[in-house]
């Protein structure tokens, strides 16, 4: 059993405290092997966001080496639980567009029914665009990554992702 598996109940209990603020959550995967985790949480300020991320039991125990912490704007105005496609079926991806230059992809694309979460990554004070984060159901990683305007980003990362949280 991995450390991540050993701490799963403790992780879920910690996340339960943020249930009302949770927009999306779940692991990134390489096939069936977890490679990371996504948590999109509506918190009041950068101090609360840092406390949420760095007090999480798995992070404290060393399960994660790095944490990317960014302000994000929810352009869909919903949570992953409101996604009309449900928790299962199809391939799901995290797409991270890391900004380079002027802001891009600020409007919700026409594929809205395939979007689980969508919005810009922003500086702590919310004034500077740093990129775009998307959770999407798509045929494959190439189609998922194509949701963003490629030449407007320094890099676009695409990771397999699945809905997280306690089993229903």
Regions found by a protein language model. Give the residues of each.
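Conserved, structured core segments of small domains
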Residues: 1-168
